[in-house]
Amino acid sequence: MKMFIRKCRRANATVGEIFQRLVKKHPNKVCIMHEDKKWTFQEIEDYSNQVANCFAKLGYTAGDDVAVFMESKVEFVTIWLGLSKIGVVPALINSNLRMKSLAFSITSVKCKAVIFGGELIQAVKDATPLLKELEDLQYFCLGQFDPAVIPAKSLDTLIPESSISPPINHKGDMNDRLFYVYTSGTTGMPKAAIIRHSRFMWLGAGIHYMNKITNDDVLYTALPLYHTAGGILSLSQTILFGNSCGIRSKFSASKFWDDCIKYEATIAQYIGELCRYILAQPEKPQDKQHKIRLMFGNGLRPQIWQQFVDRFNIPNIGELYGSTEGNANVINIDNKVGAVGFMSRIIPTVYPVSLIKVDANTGDPIRDNRGLCIRCEPGEPGEFVGKIITSDPIRQFDGYVNQNATKKKIIRDCFTKGDMAFLSGDLLRMDEDGYLFFMDRTGDTFRWRGENVSTMEVEGMISNILHHADSVVYGVEVPDNEGRAGMVAISDAEHKVDLKVLLRELWQSLPPYAVPLFVRICDTLEATGTFKLKKVDLQKEGFDPSIIKDPLYYLDKKQGAYLPLDADTYNNICSGQIRL
């Protein structure tokens, strides 16, 4: 892996330049497969060059930021690749975002244009009134759209008119920004994490060499391409190493193995929820008719790990841990059930990653009498941190566009005076052998349906809807569900909250995965001396009506309403008879 990075550094190569070498090597090899169409490396190169020349002719230059907002498709890749060839930095926006979250994602990086898919025109229209601070913002649409709805220019016309020759007016640098990937981080609205060419190369090389991916391997990912998982970890194998890759616009559990067979995939990608959905499908012959030799990803729970491997005959699992923006990353290459990676206990100080003790209530690092952090012993949960070395592309931390957000993720004087480390915001545990296991998130962010949910964002939205009433949002565990389901506790002694209005406004303002599934109505909410509302005890109590005496409600999606949650309902949710 390091040899690959050194080679790229010597050549000062960009992602686009590496891809062009692959095109010359095998122009007619299948590059990306989507639905029933196969794109060759030459076709991807030509289309991305047309994108580059199109936007260069329109006046976009190196350093300009442009939002890319569309569902997963081949053009999503060719557009960001093409823009990068002229130094324009694409902001890859979550296609589930709406209204304020969408507008914030666009304005936070001062985008000069929005490239959107015709399938998302309504979302763009709804967010447009919130984008007034961006003067002269231009809109470009790929696919069908009504100019009366959005005054956009058609890329279906502009791109084919452009030259397929490589753009000649820009020479990039591997330390340039390649694109932005949005992450909720630990608090607040979505943050734009900076992905440089060097980081894309490092992440891709890590997956490639640690999983021993060969030239003949074919990948399949059904994960969204705006995410690091699908958009970098899988597609980097295609763009940097020449592997063919099949993609899907939206994940389908019933079609997963059909796609693997169709594309003749040998490697597939997962997240924990995806594995559970696939496992819940009725058994069928296709379960073992595929050629998959490796599945890699994150979040495969120990409780279903062996069952998944046995039923679908998967020889190898590459469970990994990492974050979009961080430098603290590990991978399990030993098929150790439940482990996300390994860290030697023999000489822990030479490792660039570590576990440090944190306060269970505040999440703050615990320091010794020298003012330094304390490493965890085996069995102790601690926050995973990565040592920052600015001169090393593997160990540097580029952070976010927002510098204040970046500073919050850096801890100083971690193990020696003057050093710096990246705070992952996650609790891990190491066993006696050195294997690492994911425990929980330390901050307010929790994961549901494969997405990070920022409690601060949801709390802010609820506060506005309820005219600034006190509320806290947190994640609660639900049996046989990955991640945590959102729950809100609202201070409402007089029970004036209209849950119908609340739900209607939340559906309009938040992505579906961020809408709380449980509601608790409290007389008061306990606060700290600095007026911060406490949620640790609320989270521990979960949504169990035998423990909680406050009124409880759950979201019945069939009826589209919050309904009372009693003991029978609770048991039905826990047993899976009621699906969230």
Language model features with spans:
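Conserved pre-ATP/AMP-binding loop-to-beta segment of ANL
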Residues: 27, 141, 146-147, 160-182, ...
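AMP-binding/adenylate-forming catalytic domain of the ANL superfamily
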Residues: 142, 510-533, 549-577
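Conserved AMP-binding A3 loop
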Residues: 40-42, 171, 178-202
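Gly/Ser/Thr-rich phosphate-binding loop
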Residues: 240, 257, 262-270, 279-359, ...
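Conserved AMP-binding/adenylate-forming core of the ANL superfamily
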Residues: 7-20, 28-73, 77-81, 98-107, ...
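Conserved AMP-binding/adenylation subdomain of ANL enzymes
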Residues: 201-218, 226-266, 281
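AMP-binding/adenylate-forming catalytic core of the ANL superfamily
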Residues: 97, 104, 114-116, 322, ...
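Structural core segment of the AMP-binding/adenylate-forming
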Residues: 53, 57-58, 81, 85-160, ...
